[in-house]
Amino acid sequence: MNNEFNADWIGSPQETVNTYAVDNYKISCTFKSDNLGLVANARNKDNYVLFNIGKDSVSVYEISDNAWNDNVQYKKLLGTFHVTEHFDSLELSVNKTNVLLYLNGQKVIDEDILPKNIINQPRKTFLMSVGFNQLNSVAEISHLKIETNNLVLQEDNFENGLLSALGTCENGKLTINNAFEIVNPVPSVNLRKRFNIEKTIKSARLYASAQGFYNACINGEKVSDDFYNPGFTDYRLRIQYQTFDVTDMLADGKNVISAVLGRGHYSGFCGYSGAMIYGKESSFIAMLNIVYTDGTSEVIKTDSSWEFTDKAPISDCDYFDGESYDARLEYNPLADDKRWVKCGIKQQPKKPVPTNGTLSDTDFKLTAQKGNTAKIIKNFVGKFVCENPKNHFVYDVGQNMVGTIKLKVKGQCGQSIKIRYGEMTHKDGCIYIKNLRSAANTDIYTLCGRDTEEFIPTFASHGFRYVEIIGNGCDISKDMVISVDGLAISNIDTVTGEFECSNPLINRLQHNIRWGEIGNFLLIPTDCPQRNERMGWTGDMQVFAKTGAYNMNIKSFIDKWLDDLIDAQTMYNKNGAVPDTAPLGGDNRIDGCGGWGDAATIVPWEMYETYGDIRILKKCYDMMKKWVEYQNSTDRRNYGVRTVDGKEVPEQSDLATIPYIQVQQCRGDHLTYDNSTPYIYSATAYAAHSADILRRTAYILGKTDDEKRYTELFENIKRAFNDAWVNDDGSVSYYGEVSSQTAHCGESVALDGSVTRYTYYAENTPHCPSQTAYALAVDFDLIPQDKLKNTRKYFKNSILRNNGKLTVGFLGISHLAPALSKVGLDDVAFKLLEQEDNPSWLYSVKNGATTIWERWNSYIAETGTFGDVSMNSFNHYSYGAIGQWFFTDILGIRPVEFGYKSFMLAPKFGGGLTYAKGSFTSPYGKISSAWKLHDGKFTYDCTV
C-alpha cells in the first residue's frame, strides 16, 4: 500500500508548535478593564501565572495547587510594579523566566521573576495555555495575538476561531464577565471532508495514518475502537497505517469523513528528552476507497479540499501529561459551521536523518499495522475510598493498570473537573504522585450541562490504580461524580500461560507479573507506564522476553518491536551499536550498553524458541551480527565505565586492554541491592551469551562460515572471562567498585601506569561476590565443567549469606533461579521464591501490590515510606522475570524443538508447595502440567 498512498499530508493551515516546548513567546492585545487578569504558563486553572493589570499597578502571581508537595494551594506574589496612567494596550514578552511588559508602548516590567522548573515536577516555564481570569470583574479584549519567534500561533477577530471560546464575542471584541477561561493556542487538529454517495456501495475501505495520534470518524462515529493509532515508531524512518472496513458506516447521500489529531509521541513528550523529538506539528493522511456495485470505484483522499478547525472539544492533549476536553465546544461534523476553514498541506516526510552521520540508502516508509492495535481489554469499576484533602475525592479501581478512565458526571455548564492518577496512596488516603516526576498525568473535563456526561480521554495514557477527582479552578461536590471506571488498554489480549500453586502469595505474584506485562505492552514494551519516560528499554525487554512469551501471545507485538529495534540500530548509525531504547529515544549511552544492546540477539532468539518462526531470525540476523561485531571491535576498548563511590567514571583497570573483555558503556546490574558486580564483568558475560546465540542462529540459517566464526568468538570470550574472574576452585572474584572508604582493597594498574585501589570481592574475604556474578557465569555456561561442582557451593553461599534474600538487579533477575536449577540448587531457588521479607518477590505482594515494582524497596510498609522518587515505578515488569521459572521448572514445560513441535515435561517440587498446576498454549497446542504432594506421595498429571 505504501507506493499506492497517493494522498497529501494535511493539518493546520498555519505552522504550529507544541506550546509545552515554547519558553519564548509574546502576547499582545488591546483591552478595556479596570482589573485585567491575563493568564499564561497555564497547565490548568490551578497552575498558572497571573498578570493582574489594575488602575495603578501590575502584580504578577504564581498560582499552584502544590500537588507534588503537600496539596496546600498557594498564590505567590512574584512582583508588583506601579503605573501612573490609564492603559488600553499591552505587549507581554516572556523568555524563560524573564518578563518584559509594555503598556501602551511604555516599559513597565523587565525582570527575571517567573517560577523556574523544579526537578521531578511538572514544567512551569512554558507557554502551555493562556486566557483571562475575570472572576468578579469584566474585561473587553480585541486584537489578541499570540506568537513565538515570529510564528503566529493565534490571531483572532473573535468571530469563529479558537479564541472566541474565551468569552462572548460581538463586533470583533471578546467580553469576559465574571469568568475564568483558558485555551491552548495550539490545540488538537480537527479535519473533515464532506461528500455525497449516489450509488450502491459494494465495499469501502479506509486507509489512514498520522504524524501524531488520530481518531478517524465516518458520519460522526469512530471507525474502530482502537486507541493511539498509528502507534509508536521512529517517525523519522517509518510510520504505520491502519486499514478499516467502513462499508456499513456510509450512507446514501451526504457523508463526512473526519479526523481529530493529538500530539502523541510525534510532537508531544517522548521519554524524558522533552517534546517535539520527531516533529513540530501533527498531520494526517488517508484514502477512502469505495467500490460500487456497478463496478465503478471512487477514491476520497486527503488533499486541499479538506477543512480544518481548532475550535473543538479537545483543547489540549499529551500522551504523558493528559487531555483537556471542553464539551461546550462539541460540533456536528456534517453541519455548516463558520469554524471550518481550508486545511493546510503539510510537507511530505523527508529522507531520514539519523542521530549520527548520514544514511544514503534509507528512505521514509509507510508500513501496514503489524499485530494488534491498542484496545480496551478490561473494565475495572472504581470504588470511592475517601475525601482527603477536602473536596479531593479518591477512587480505587482495584488494579494497577494502564489506559484511561470512563468518567460519568453531572453538573452545570462550564463547571470543570480535574482528574489525577496515582499508583499508590499515602496512609491517609491521599494519592501518591511524586513518582510521576514531570509527567502531569492529569485530565480535564469541562461540562456542557447535559443530565449525564461521559468522558473517556483518547489521546492520553495513564498508569494508575487510584483516581482523584477534584475541581479545576473551583470546588466540586462528590454528588457530581456518578461513576469512575478504569479502562485497561493493551496491544496484547490472549493469555497463553496459566499457573497456580498452593501458596496464594505466589499466585498473586503470577497475577502481578501478567498485569505488569499487559499494561506495559502498549504500543511498545515500555519500562513503566506512568512517569515521564515510558520508553522501549532494551534491557528490560531482554530479561523479560521468555516470561512474557509464556504468559501471553506476544508474537506479533514483539515482531513489530523488533522492527523498531532494527530501525533504532539504523538510525543510531554507530557501527552496529544498539541504543538503549527502541524506538530511539533519549538517554542513550554514547556507544551502546552491555546487557541492553544484547536484546538484539536475546529477544529474537527467545521468540524463535517459543514460536518456531524462522522468519524472525532471518529478519534480525543482520542486526544481531552487527551488534556482536560491534561489541568485539578493537576500537571499543577503553570506552567503558565503572562506579567510583557510586559515580560513573571511565573504566581504566588493567583488564581494559585484554582482548575479548567487554570494556564498554554499561548500566550494570541496575537497581541491585549489591552493586559490586563490575560493569566490565556483566558486559563480558552478556557478550559471550550474544556470541553463543549468534553461532546457534548461524547454524539454523545454514551460514556455515559465520557459525564457525562465532563459535570461536564465544570460546575466546569465555576463555577471557575465565582468565579474568574464575578461580581454580570454581569461585569468582573481581575488583569491584572503586572507593577510598573500603576496608579491603586490591590494586590495579591503569593504562598510564598509575595504581588505583579497587574493592576486592572474593570468597572468604570481607567482600564476597554477588548473586548476579554467579548467576550470569552459570546460566551463560561460562564456568568449565570441571569447576562447576565447586561453583555450585559458592553460588549457594551467595544466597545463604544474605539470609535467603535477593540482592540481584535487572541483569541478574532472569538468570538467578534458572542458574540455581541448572546446578541442582532447586531447594535454594524455592527458598528465594517463598521469601517474604524485603528484598524478595513476595514482599510487595504481602503489601498489596497488583503489579511488579521497579525497586525491591519501592515502598517500605513498616515505615510507610516510598523509594527514591527519581525512579520508583509500581508497574515495572523486569523483576517479574522469575515467571519463566514457574513454567520451565515448577511445571517443567520446556521446548525440545523450536516452537514446541516437541517438548519435555520435567516438573520440580520443593519448598512449602503441596501442589502446582498450569498450562502453556504453544503454536502446536495446549500443554498442561499438574502435580501434588499428599501424605508423602507425589502425583503427576499432564495433558498434551
Where are these regions (language model features)?
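Short tryptophan-centered beta-strand motifs in secreted/extracellular beta-sheet-rich domains
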Residues: 27-29, 83-95, 99-103
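Non-catalytic C-terminal accessory modules of carbohydrate-active enzymes
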Residues: 276, 285-287, 300-334, 357-359, ...
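A carbohydrate-recognition surface predominantly in extracellular/luminal proteins
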Residues: 18-34, 144
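Alpha-helical support elements that line or immediately flank enzyme active sites
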Residues: 204-213, 218-219, 404-423, 469-472, ...
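C-terminal capping/lid segments that line or modulate ligand- or cofactor-binding pockets
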Residues: 257, 325-326, 532-533, 538, ...
